[in-house]
Each structure stands twice: as C-alpha cells, then as structure tokens.
C-alpha cells in the first residue's frame, strides 16, 4: 500500500512539475498568460456602461428622447440599435467630426443609437469558438483611413490608430489635475519590448527607471472610449549610445527595454528601420506627437495625436540654411543628423523630442521606415529653417548590435 502511495505521489508531483515547466515556457514565449491575446480576439476592459435608462437621451423629430448616447462600438451599424456589451461592432466605418458634434452627444465618440424593443438588450446567442486566422505581422503599416472611423474637421490630427508604432514616454507618478507635465518624450515601437527614442529625453532617468513608463496605442488622451485600449509598460533598462553628447546632442539615440512585451493589436505595431547609411529623398514623410504641454490637456482639440507632413532636406542645403541662423557661418552639421521641413508653419516644435520622423519605404511605398528622431531646431516653422533629427540609418548597426546583445530579434523592424 505504501509503495502504491509513493508511486501515485510521484506521478502527481511529476505531472505538476511538468505543468510548471510548460507554463513557464508559455510565459517565456507569449508573456503573462493574462496578457496574451491570440490574433482575431480582443479583451474589452472598459467599465460597464450601466443601465440603458441612465444614459443621456437623444433623437430628433419623432425619435426625440427615444434614443440614447452610447459609445460608437456599442451601436449596431445595420439596425442602429444598442448591442450587448458582449457584442462589439468592429466593422463600422463612421465619420466623426471632432470640431462640431452634430449628433447631440457630449463626446464625439458617442453616437445617438436606438433602444431595442422594450428597452431590454437581447441575450447573445451562444456561438461555437472561432479559430483565429493567423495574419502575418509586418512593420511600418499605416492605417491611413484610421480604425473603425474617419475623422473630419481636423487640423493636423492623426486618424485613430493611423500610426501604430507611436509611443508616449510618460512620468509614472503624475497626480491628475496637478498641472505637472506628464509627457516626457515621444518614441517608436521597433519590437514588442523595445522602444526607440532620443537619448536627450531619457538620459536623466537611467538611475531612476521607476519614474517613467511607456504607453502604446494611445490616440486621444482625454478619453478611453476607443474600441482598442492603450497598453502601458514599465521600463527595465535604458540603453544610451556611448558617444551621446548632451551639450551638442550628437548621437542622440536610446533604446528602452520594457519589463514585458506589448501585445500586438490593430493600434499597436512596429515601424521598419532603414539599412545602415540609407538616404531618403521624399516629400511625403511625417512626424507625429502630442506636444509636451498638450498631452492630457483640457485645451480643446490639443489632446489628439498630431501629424505633420514634411519633405526631406539634403545635408548640404540643411547646413547652408542653418548657417543663416544664429548658429553662424562656421556651423557644421554632424553626420549623426538629418533634416526635414523648412516650410512656413510646418515643424516639430511643440516639445515632441524623441518622436519619430518616418518616410515611405522606397522599395514598397505602402510601408513606412523611420528616418529620424526629433532632436532639435532653431525657431519654429520658419521658412528655410529645417528641423534637425537624429539619423536613424546612421545607427542601424548599433541598434542591431544592442538587440543581439540582449538576445532580442531584429525581425520586428525588418519584416
């Protein structure tokens, strides 16, 4: 009997140990199981909207007061009626005007939606589990028309989810309403657990990593009504280029290693990186960011991610233009910089240091490569005064070496 007990116990504890090994392997590959979402699925973490009768009423004419204001993805686009929380409309292509809300609802992301008969939501019919189709993951894919909806009436606002690689580097312990600036810098996602940003942004945080965090998938900083939530991560290491000069901002590049990988979603993806020494010549590059003073601001329309289209400026012209400024005739543009802009009223001058400058891939214009990192400039949006950016192509080999030294794959910013 004792022998049988020992054998049984051996199998029980052996199975438990084996399961632990398997669980550890799963976590190693996918991250925490609670964070892993297979492609084709999503987790909605929004708070319940409450009873329908408590929602603001809307409607015009005969429907006046018979409809309710509800977030856009809770309204069926075909029947124009409210759906249960378990059913989320992800196929709508609404057009929202962020300047004038003509649908009577307080938020531009709310719609005036009809109530089901009797005011009671139908119980969703059970459906068999859907086996997700694994879609290939590509870097540099821009959602030009946005996700779910397209906005009108904008002034340089990006569409929702337009640039999935955009990341905000934030102070971790800002008290809401304190007036303290929350945004430290911008950045770009180059791998699930790696953010590329400017060294000048994070140099002072190397010994105080708990003071900052990153946020990916953000768009409008004053609402969480978007269908896809943003994701935040802590930073476990800051890697600054060893030759970074804080006084001249030469070699202004840094990598932020996250405490765990971000989960890929339609609003979160990576940007492609250029080959070493690659040169860009394009009028269709973009820079994006919120602006340090505008992030989370209550000033109207300043809370949505901005974009600005900029032309590249070749090195000789950029240096000549900058010599006409207070820099003087002896100024020499370091090879670690590239230039863009120089058009009246178009510049990255709102405190968006570390944010990406990206251009169409010359071999595949439907994808984007990161040309630069917002570094410095003279004035703001003046004619013939280009903005200056860290030259990402100059640092490609350095980025690869740092990634490989940490055992991280370079594939997410190549394919």
UniProtKB/Swiss-Prot annotation:
Which positions fall inside the Clip domain?
57-113
Transmembrane domains' residue ranges? none
Origin: domain of life: Eukaryota
Q: Which GO terms describe its biological process?
A: defense response to bacterium; innate immune response; proteolysis
The feature of type site (Cleavage) is located at 99-100
Primary location group? secreted
SUPFAM superfamilies documented for this protein: Trypsin-like serine proteases
Q: What induces it?
A: Up-regulated in response to Gram-negative bacterial infections.
Post-translational modifications = The N-terminus is blocked. Proteolytically cleaved by PPAF3. Cleavage produces a light chain and a heavy chain, which probably remain covalently associated through an interchain disulfide bond.
Domain Peptidase S1: start-end pairs? 151-404
Any idea which GO molecular function terms this record carries? metal ion binding; serine-type endopeptidase activity
The listed locations are: Secreted
- Tell me the function of this protein: Binds and activates processed prophenoloxidases PPO1 and PPO2 and thus is involved in the activation of the prophenoloxidase cascade probably following the recognition of pathogen-derived products.
Q: How does it assemble?
A: Heterodimer of a light chain and a heavy chain; disulfide-linked. Can oligomerize into a dodecamer. Interacts (via CLIP domain) with cleaved PPO1 and/or PPO2; the interaction results in PPO1 and/or PPO2 activation.
Note in the entry = Stabilized by calcium.
Q: What is known of its domains?
A: The clip domain consists of 35-55 residues which are 'knitted' together usually by 3 conserved disulfide bonds forming a clip-like compact structure. The clip domain interacts with cleaved PPO1 and/or PPO2; the interaction results in PPO1 and/or PPO2 activation.
What protein am I looking at?
Answer: Phenoloxidase-activating factor 2
Protein's organism: Holotrichia diomphalia (Korean black chafer)
């Amino acid at each position: 009997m004792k022998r049988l007990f020992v054998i049984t116990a051996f199998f029980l504890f052996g199975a438990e140990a084996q399961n632990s090994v398997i669980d550890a392997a799963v976590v190693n590959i996918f991250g925490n199981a609670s964070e892993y979402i297979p492609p084709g699925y999503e987790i909605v973490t929004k708070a319940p909207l409450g009873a329908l009768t408590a929602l603001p009423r809307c409607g015009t004419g005969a429907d006046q007061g018979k409809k309710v204001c509800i977030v856009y993805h809770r309204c069926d686009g075909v029947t124009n009626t409210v759906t249960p929380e378990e059913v989320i409309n992800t196929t709508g292509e609404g057009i929202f005007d962020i300047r004038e809300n003509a649908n009577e609802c307080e938020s531009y992301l709310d719609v005036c939606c009809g109530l089901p008969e009797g005011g009671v939501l139908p119980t969703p019919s059970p459906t068999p589990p859907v086996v997700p189709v694994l879609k290939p993951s590509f870097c540099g894919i821009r959602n030009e028309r946005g996700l779910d909806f397209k906005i009108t009436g904008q002034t340089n606002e990006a569409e929702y989810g337009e640039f999935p690689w955009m990341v905000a580097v934030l102070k971790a312990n800002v008290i809401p309403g304190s007036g303290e600036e929350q945004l430290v810098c911008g950045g770009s996602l180059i791998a699930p657990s790696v953010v590329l940003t400017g060294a000048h942004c994070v140099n002072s945080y190397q010994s105080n990593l708990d003071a900052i965090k990153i946020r990916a998938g953000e768009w409008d900083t004053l609402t969480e009504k978007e269908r896809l939530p943003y994701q935040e991560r802590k930073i476990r290491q800051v890697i600054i280029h060893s030759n970074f000069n804080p006084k001249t901002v030469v070699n202004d590049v840094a990598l932020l290693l996250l405490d765990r990988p971000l989960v890929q979603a339609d609003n979160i993806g990576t940007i492609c990186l250029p080959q070493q020494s690659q040169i860009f010549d394009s009028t269709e590059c973009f820079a994006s960011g919120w602006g340090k003073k505008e992030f989370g601001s209550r000033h109207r329309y300043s809370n949505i991610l901005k974009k600005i289209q900029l032309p590249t400026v070749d090195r000789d012209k950029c240096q000549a233009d900058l010599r006409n400024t207070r820099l003087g005739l002896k100024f020499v543009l370091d090879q670690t910089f590239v230039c863009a802009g120089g058009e009246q009223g178009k510049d990255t001058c709102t405190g968006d240091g570390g944010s990406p400058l990206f251009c169409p891939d010359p071999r595949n214009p439907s994808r984007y490569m990161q040309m630069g990192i917002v570094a410095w400039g003279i004035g703001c949006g003046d004619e013939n005064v280009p903005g200056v950016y860290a030259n990402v192509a100059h640092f490609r080999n350095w980025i690869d070496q740092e990634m490989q030294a940490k055992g991280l794959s370079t594939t997410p910013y190549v394919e």
